[in-house]
Amino acid sequence: PYTTLFRSLREINDAVQIPTIRKDFIIDEYMIYEAKLLGASCVLLIAALLDTETIRQYKAICDQLGLSALVEAHDEAEAASALAAGARMVGVNNRNLKDFTVDIHNSTRLRELVPRNVLFVAESGIKTAEDIAELVSAGVNGVLIGETLMRSPDKARMLDELRSRI
């Protein structure tokens, strides 16, 4: 439920001293203001849902509010849109949102299209420390891991395992 988002994000922000992201389908600028009120430090802007001008406008709102914007792309056209909108942080979703197949090499392939001065984050499908090592060697600056951690019965151990190759 919608109220769970508010409670969860606030509880997380109260419990940790690290940046948090509102990983949601941001489709209205109001949601960016909500993210700020909830204590998020970053919002996810999905290029598959937003045209270049909308990404640019939402990114400007983020800048005014002191929020980071992670602009997510899945293919070359979406990466180009993110860059044209002025993204300083691009995330590449390794999960194809049309058929839900996963290929972590999507990040290594698209890394070549994104200038090195733009932070590059690999998202989805990262399951092992070896996956992370491969991504880091390809120039990836960070990873966004959700499902692997959430499915693990021992999340702390899994996180230590994933960090072991960085």
Annotate each predicted stretch with a short phrase.
Residues 15-18, 37-43, 63-67, 84-91, ...:
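Glycine-enriched alpha-helix->loop->beta-strand junction motifs that scaffold or abut catalytic
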Residues 6-15, 21-22, 28-37, 42:
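Acidic/glycine-rich phosphate/pyrophosphate-binding loops and surrounding catalytic core
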Residues 18-28, 41-52, 65-79, 91-101, ...:
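Catalytic beta/alpha-barrel core
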Residues 1-5:
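Short, small-residue-biased leader/transition segments that mark boundaries at the very start
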Residues 6-10, 103-109:
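Charged helix-capping and loop-helix junction motifs
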